[in-house]
Amino acid sequence: LARTQTGISDYGFFIQTDAAINPGNSGGALVDSKARLIGINSAIFSKSGGSVGIGFAIPVNMVKIVIAAAKSGGKQVRRPWLGASLQVVSKEIADSIGLDRPVGALVADMNPKGPAADAGLKRGDVIMAVDGQAIDDPEGLGYRLGTKSIGGTTEFTVMRSGKKTQLSVKLVPAPETPARDSVTIDAPSPFMGATIVNLSPATAEEYSVEGASQGVVIAQIAPDSQAAALNFQRGDVVMSINDAKIETTRDLEKTVGKRHYFWKITISRGGQVLTSVFGG
């Protein structure tokens, strides 16, 4: 029932439904034929804004985590952090490790201080199941972790060198180190109207950052601002300005406070490094 990659959320695992969902009833309950709650209506696929028979609901297992966080007084939902980069298992990879079909999530890289590394996961491992629940792809793994509460451990079934092994992974949140230090840029510059935060494991996960290990993240862009006009996007990582590295929000704030005849800006977007030059 669940569909991923809808582009609606960072934890984009939804129940797809043909129930009519319109702006007025989003947030309502999605129930089965026995009146059991299975999800909360969240979004529709529509160009007109009205229902066209393709709707999406947040699965009830994820809703439970949000409710528990609210009851405990939390200001945000903290989800378990794996500390690993994952990729889809291709047919060629599946054949090479003895799988009869492409399933699971391949470990491509790891944070040396993350839960994956602590548990003994290695590059090239394929995560096949979480607590006995089969994993089809990286998005499926994200969903399984997203329904877990912080604290304790979860059991991974891993394929390594043609053999299955069990590993216990700690359920801990992504650390926010360095601190977020949110700054909104109002100085005349290509970034005017953008809100930036420091890059950390927590903000990288929150804004779906891929590949970047240094820089600051664009968290928000005001409509009709200079940053919007220049097509900067939420989740872009600003790595350097005029070949000077940007390590923190304060670095960027100081840089835009100076006059420049031109702006050579290098960003990371979706794992790709892009460089653009703008007039001063």
Question: For each predicted feature, which ranges?
Answer:
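C-terminal recognition in membrane/secretory proteostasis and scaffolding
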Residues: 37, 62-280
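Short beta-strand scaffold segments in enzyme catalytic cores
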Residues: 29-30, 156
